[in-house]
Amino acid sequence: TWSEYKQYFERDAALERRFQMVKVDEPDDDTACLMLRGLKSRYAQHHGVHITDEAVKAAVTLSRRYLTGRQLPDKAVDLLDTASARVRMSLDTVPEPLTRMKAQLTALAMEKQALLEDIAVGNTAHGERLAAIGEEEVGIILQLDERETRYGQELKLTEELLACRTDISRQGEIADLQMQLTAVQQNTPLLGLDVDARTVATVIADWTGVPLSSLMKDEQTELLSLEHSLAKRVVGQDSALNAIAQRLRASKTGLAPENGPQGVFLLVGPSGTGKTETALALADELFGGEKSLITINLSEYQEPHTVSQLKGSPPGYVGYGQGGILTEAVRKRPYSVVLLDEVEKAHRDVMNLFYQVFDRGFMRDGEGREIDFRNTVILMTSNLGSDLIMQMLDENPVATEGELHELLRPVLRDHFQPALLARFQTVIYRQLAQAAMRTIVGMKLGQVSQRLARHYGMKTAIADSLSDALTDACLLPDTGARNIDSLLNQQILPVLSQQLLSQMAAGRKPHTLT
């Protein structure tokens, strides 16, 4: 590696002179696919399975995106090898879902036996749990019977398909058998016949924790409806979400310049209007989960020397070699959403750090490494000009985006350097209307109902009067939707917990809460 070359060869001029340095860079996706196609036959022969070309492409694409810290083609080869081994194992062993369900039945049987032993010595408090165990056992047995039947059908069809592939006289039966197998599997195969893109995505999901559904999503279809997907979580900000979605579509289709991040946005607006929730929703939609959100609170970086915390200390300073908070986070997750919160509170020297990031998509850390930001979406949040926005919308509720941008331009120009201001897109978040606030109240109360159902098995009936009261209480200009959580935590949830504890202390367990 380059570090070893510097350590052992460069320091010895005589030794360095006797070697010609050949720089070997990581291949691009097309070259990596070509290399894997050359290796594919060896792995297929070793594991005794067929590896499709879409599996090769998926191995390269998904490994580049989700397996950080390693290089292509090495990580794609490991991914393809593991996927091939899984397909081979699925043909020779009982599928993992069946094994897991049998283990669940065994665990329930052990718990049931322990409870019966307690009852035998006079403990009568386990009747409700015994009934629940019986219901769980019935449900698992029904699922197990259905899956074992389907597994038998899949295994029979798979064996017939493998036999047809080796028998030239039966080649015409392959298409019909393949259709039957697809109909039986219904997008949830218990065993694999070939190594395909789904098999590779399953391995990535197990290694990284990214949901399989996110890995298998059609990115083009997802981008077309991105603003609608975001609007399910961010309520009442349609124009802002539309602006973000349009910019991201331009980046993903290759129309925007390729030497910068996917998008750089400054989200400006009053507190509690959905700016942080937008970052969470984008991480979930684009990169498979909220774990792909990197949050940096810039209110902690009000001194010029705090720059080293973000990018790492330079040589000779305390902390050299430990990396920076931002640079190391992006190195580990190059496909992520970077949220720079409260950007107006950061020192100007800290903001100067982002000129090259916004423009060319990279930052050089304290050790001289170039950290690639080109696959990130960068969101900055700020309350600059919030009072002006609220004042204009109070006077003219139907003010256009252009009018709001003209209103904010002097405020932003006073705070940000013109060169920095030209490097990001400003997105304005409006004060939430009553209808949007009521929708958010309903979502928050629904989350409380789900928690009660999950922990206590209780059904919840929420009166309209409660939703109306919470909505009216949250229509304050300075707090927005953030006040909903405050009201729930301070007034609603303490009363609920008191009632629940009182009922449980009295030995009663209510099934419905109103």
Place the predicted regions along the sequence by residue.
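AAA+ P-loop NTPase nucleotide-binding core of proteostasis motors
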Residues: 1-514
